[in-house]
């Protein structure tokens, strides 16, 4: 029986921004590549990333407007060129940038004649306007226009339910998606005897964040979605261990002795400049450490085993794994 050798890929995935431009204040474009990928991985990543970019990133919108002078949505106001419906549509198009949580109040209060634009909106400190020139209304006469606004941060697309305007407020359908469009394409090539792929990812945003920022946030959101599956598997393993009469009890490791030995050598090497991604840590451990702002070996050694065990999804085997890797490093020999 002849067995074929199994090719183990030792490639390192790399991504790069190959094109970036701002077509306008409300239209940014970015083109990225990721390679080298094995056959089929391009679609796997591209489809997941497209869904995450369009559906998992939060944005900020005006979701409600209120004015005492407006009898109903399709009415007109004397002295204003636009109808109430047109004004609401213009407010809906305003692009906002924020890090707020929940709902905030904003307002417009201007006196005509003149042009009302986005710069006339009085915003809370946590919100800013991407394009101050966005048009809202034209006041043709010396009248006052006062509108109370509700601003909300959310994700996806929300269709508001009409409230019959009993409180003189008008709910607006909100498109919270800061990413306007995403395309992915795949270029296949042969490297030796192995078929590989390059993933091309094109991202258009509304200016509230750059395509690079959108890519980063979508990646983080995907990681957050997959972590529970890993945790569930760990719980399943622990359950089997508890119910297994032949289970092996993990030995107690002399964490403090090992860490104390490593800490004594702190002054001999530039620990602050050795990043944890330079060590061969499994992705799950690496992500757990990064989430707790542990970026270097200096940061890592400043945490006791008890502190490391408090990290969400962290296990006792992970601490042992970290110590084993550190002891294998030449600098810690």
Curated annotation (Swiss-Prot):
Any notes on this protein's domains? The N-terminal domain is essential for RNAP assembly and basal transcription, whereas the C-terminal domain is involved in interaction with transcriptional regulators and with upstream promoter elements.
UniProt-annotated stretches for the region Alpha C-terminal domain (alpha-CTD): 269-333
The record's region (Alpha N-terminal domain (alpha-NTD)) falls at 1-233
Please report which protein family the annotation says this sequence is part of: Belongs to the RNA polymerase alpha chain family.
Reaction(s) this enzyme catalyzes, per UniProt: RNA(n) + a ribonucleoside 5'-triphosphate = RNA(n+1) + diphosphate
Q: Outline what the protein does.
A: DNA-dependent RNA polymerase catalyzes the transcription of DNA into RNA using the four ribonucleoside triphosphates as substrates.
Q: Where in the cell is it found?
A: Plastid, Chloroplast
Name-wise, this protein is: DNA-directed RNA polymerase subunit alpha
What does the entry give for GO biological process? DNA-templated transcription
Kinase among keywords: no
Q: Which UniProt keywords apply?
A: Chloroplast, DNA-directed RNA polymerase, Nucleotidyltransferase, Plastid, Transcription, Transferase
Q: How does it assemble?
A: In plastids the minimal PEP RNA polymerase catalytic core is composed of four subunits: alpha, beta, beta', and beta''. When a (nuclear-encoded) sigma factor is associated with the core the holoenzyme is formed, which can initiate transcription.
Q: Which InterPro entries match?
A: DNA-dir_RNA_pol_insert, DNA-dir_RNA_pol_RpoA/D/Rpb3, DNA-dir_RpoA, RBP11-like, RNAP_asu_C, RNApol_insert_sf
What's the source species' lineage?
A: Eukaryota, Viridiplantae, Streptophyta, Embryophyta, Tracheophyta
Task: Give the originating organism.
Answer: Cucumis sativus (Cucumber)
> What is the superkingdom listed in this entry's lineage?
Eukaryota
List the record's Gene Ontology CC terms alphabetically. chloroplast; DNA-directed RNA polymerase complex; mitochondrion
